[in-house]
Regions:
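Rhodanese-like catalytic fold shared by cysteine-dependent sulfurtransferases
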Residues: 1-34, 42-83, 92-128
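Short, surface-exposed ligand- or partner-binding patches at beta-edge/loop junctions that are enriched
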Residues: 87
Length: 128
């Protein structure tokens, strides 16, 4: 039996999903053209903070939370007509998550290469 490594899975996902820069994500977010979704776990948010104007949906709940019948979508917290931009700490989990959303049928999905750390370096602000 051959088991793929996480690195192989991420590499495969990166070949299938759109990767955007932190600067591109910042522009989309400032123009209110995207749902900026932080898929890091709660411990990471507590330790490092959350990006302003982002939604927190942990990776393990993403598929359930972003489905059109979910309360996030039903309560207009997430607008599925906008681009869905995912980020994690460094970009691996968000690439995998973006691939999963594409498999679910979402068309306008991307992830931020470099993740939270690079986003902070490029000027994203954290919530206080």
């Amino acid at each position: 039996m051959s088991i793929k490594s996480p690195q192989t899975l991420v590499s495969e996902a990166l070949n299938e999903v759109k990767t955007i820069t932190p600067e591109e994500a910042m522009k989309l977010n400032s123009e209110n053209k995207c749902n900026l979704i932080d898929i890091r776990d709660g411990v990471e948010l507590e330790k490092l903070g959350a990006i302003e104007n982002s939604f927190h949906i942990p990776r393990g709940l993403l598929e359930f939370s972003i489905h059109p019948e979910s309360s996030y979508v039903q309560n207009n917290q997430i607008d599925l007509n906008k681009e869905t931009v995912l980020f994690c700490a460094a970009g691996g989990r968000s690439a995998l998550a973006a691939k999963t959303l594409k498999e679910m049928g979402f068309k306008n999905v991307s992830h931020v290469g470099g993740g939270f750390g690079l986003m902070i370096q490029k000027g994203f602000k954290t919530k206080t």
